[in-house]
């Protein structure tokens, strides 16, 4: 079942849906601004569970209002639906279309906020009334405090009420709501309202076996895979038991995560060697991270592109102790780096350039002597490898991208493979040659001074 790559058999259905929504004048503002649409193609067949599937029902949400063959098995456009040789489809839009959650020709929402969810709209209106009163300036200082607390609690309760009502099926008939699926985090706004979850929900509700799903944006008519921020955790549940193709991005990061190695572990701490490309802590894309894999608590971070040693705690008290050591600069760290150009062996010095985020070009950082935060790095050139200077870097501060910026701006010699600050055209296709190779900590329980080391993977394979 294709969902992350376009199945050609979906194209005729996509064209029929596009022809349909372009014919409705009331929808054209949404269409011009860009609305996600999707189709799910299937072959009418006996249900996977719950009895026989009634083919006559398939027209209920189809664009024409009657069963239509969107493609034959060989990918060619079909004619009328006949037994065994033709496909049909379901269609969906994300969020609302023409200001409504339900429209003829499309599957219904998983939870209809404009119908059965009227309580949400009424409670939302009352919370908005609190906002208007606070903005009016008529509230006393005591009222402001009380109303802000009330607004926060009611908003939180309303959000949980809504998420609990999105009950999502999978092919096995199992159901889970958004709170269960995203636990322990809070689901993002709009979760469950994208095309793929809506299509799968209707298919499983009716016992349809999906063959493929395709989504596209009406603004550019290009195919897009399901979004990661809202859909990845949902699809992990809904696609259980299907033959759906693997999420290629997730598979890629799982391959990277498999290279995570434990350097040291006891009852209080765990020290790992993080490969380049693996997140230190969970992000918005719900990809594997060191924290999620080890089920330990982060005490510091490495950039996603940086490899090397990370120290994690197994309890909150140990985490607090180690974070305090980092804050007090009691922990020593040394990095190996290969730079784009050669440098004289034995050269050493200190780079001190204040840094701040480049607000208009995140996640890049920039040097700012007026508003930047102090950043200091010691460096020493210990050799040249295949035309690239090999440095040992010892930071005294821990600013975002500090070592990358200090090499690029302070030494005018970016780190090899730096896709943000590098000058080589092939930087984006290379591994960042920056590795946290040594760290010295005081064990939170024993008080023992511990020095742990690792060797960069890339030292043995240079361009």
Regions of interest found by a model, annotated:
Residues 1-463:
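RNA pseudouridine synthases
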């Amino acid at each position: 079942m294709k969902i992350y790559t376009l199945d050609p058999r979906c194209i005729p259905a996509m064209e029929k849906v596009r022809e349909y929504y372009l014919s409705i004048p009331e929808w054209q503002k949404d269409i011009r601004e860009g609305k996600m649409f999707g189709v799910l193609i299937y072959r009418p067949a006996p249900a996977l569970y719950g009895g026989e599937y009634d083919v006559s029902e398939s027209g209920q949400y189809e664009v024409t209002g009657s069963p239509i063959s969107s493609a034959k098995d060989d990918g060619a456009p079909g004619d009328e639906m006949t037994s065994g040789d033709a496909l049909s489809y379901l269609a969906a839009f994300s969020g609302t279309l023409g200001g409504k959650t339900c429209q003829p020709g499309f599957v219904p929402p998983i939870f209809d906020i404009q119908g059965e969810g009227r309580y949400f709209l009424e409670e939302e209106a009352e919370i908005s009334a609190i906002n208007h009163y606070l903005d009016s300036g008529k509230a006393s200082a005591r009222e402001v405090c009380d109303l802000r607390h009330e607004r926060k609690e009611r908003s939180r309760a309303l959000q949980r009420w809504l998420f609990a009502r999105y009950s999502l099926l999978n092919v096995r008939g199992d159901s889970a709501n958004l709170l269960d699926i995203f636990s322990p985090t809070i689901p993002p706004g709009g979760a469950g309202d994208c095309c793929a979850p809506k299509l799968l929900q209707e298919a499983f509700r009716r016992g349809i076996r999906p063959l493929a799903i395709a989504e596209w944006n009406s603004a550019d008519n290009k195919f897009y895979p399901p979004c990661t921020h809202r859909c990845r955790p949902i699809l992990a549940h809904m696609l259980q038991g299907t033959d759906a193709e693997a999420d290629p991005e997730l598979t890629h990061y799982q391959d990277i995560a498999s290279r995570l190695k434990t350097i040291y572990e006891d009852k209080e701490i765990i020290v790992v060697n993080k490969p380049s490309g693996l997140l230190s802590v969970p992000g918005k894309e719900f990809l594997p991270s060191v924290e999620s894999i080890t089920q330990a608590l982060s005490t510091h971070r490495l950039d996603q592109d940086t490899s090397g040693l990370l120290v994690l705690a197994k309890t909150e008290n140990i985490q607090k102790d180690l974070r305090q050591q980092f804050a007090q600069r009691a922990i020593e760290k040394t990095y190996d780096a290969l730079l784009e150009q050669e440098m004289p062996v034995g050269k050493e010095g200190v780079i001190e350039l204040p840094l701040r985020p480049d607000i208009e070009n995140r996640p890049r950082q920039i040097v700012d002597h007026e508003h930047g935060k102090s950043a200091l790095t010691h460096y020493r050139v210990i050799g040249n490898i295949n035309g690239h200077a090999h440095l040992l870097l010892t930071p005294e501060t821990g600013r975002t991208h500090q070592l990358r910026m200090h090499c690029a701006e302070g030494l005018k010699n970016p780190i090899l493979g730096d896709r943000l600050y590098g000058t080589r055209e092939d930087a984006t296709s290379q591994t960042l040659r920056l590795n946290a190779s040594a760290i010295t900590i005081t064990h939170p329980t024993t008080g023992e001074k511990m020095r742990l080391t690792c060797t960069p993977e890339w030292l043995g394979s240079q361009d």
